[in-house]
Amino acid sequence: REVCELNPDCDELADHIGFQEAYR
């Protein structure tokens, strides 16, 4: 989601599950 780009917390999440999953 676009919110992920503005959410620093999502960056850590992406590190765990993968960017494609986090930014889906």
From Swiss-Prot:
Domain of life the protein comes from: Eukaryota
Stated family: Belongs to the osteocalcin/matrix Gla protein family.
InterPro entries xref list: GLA-like_dom_SF, GLA_domain, Osteocalcin
Molecular-function annotations in GO: calcium ion binding; hormone activity; hydroxyapatite binding; structural constituent of bone
Coiled coil region boundaries: none
Any one biological process term the GO annotation gives: biomineral tissue development
Location of the Gla domain: 1-24
Residues annotated for Ca(2+) 3 binding in this entry: 5, 11
Transmembrane parts of this sequence: none
Record function comment: The carboxylated form is one of the main organic components of the bone matrix, which constitutes 1-2% of the total bone protein: it acts as a negative regulator of bone formation and is required to limit bone formation without impairing bone resorption or mineralization. The carboxylated form binds strongly to apatite and calcium. The uncarboxylated form acts as a hormone secreted by osteoblasts, which regulates different cellular processes, such as energy metabolism, male fertility and brain development. Regulates of energy metabolism by acting as a hormone favoring pancreatic beta-cell proliferation, insulin secretion and sensitivity and energy expenditure.
Primary location: secreted
Compartment annotation: Secreted
Protein name listed in UniProt: Osteocalcin
Residues modified as 4-carboxyglutamate: 2, 5
Disulfide cysteine pairs (residue numbers): 4-10
Protein modification: Gamma-carboxyglutamate residues are formed by vitamin K dependent carboxylation by GGCX. These residues are essential for the binding of calcium. Decarboxylation promotes the hormone activity.
Keywords in alphabetical order: Biomineralization, Calcium, Disulfide bond, Extinct organism protein, Gamma-carboxyglutamic acid, Hormone, Metal-binding, Secreted
Record-level GO cellular component terms: extracellular region
Binding, Ca(2+) 2: 2, 5
GN (gene name): BGLAP
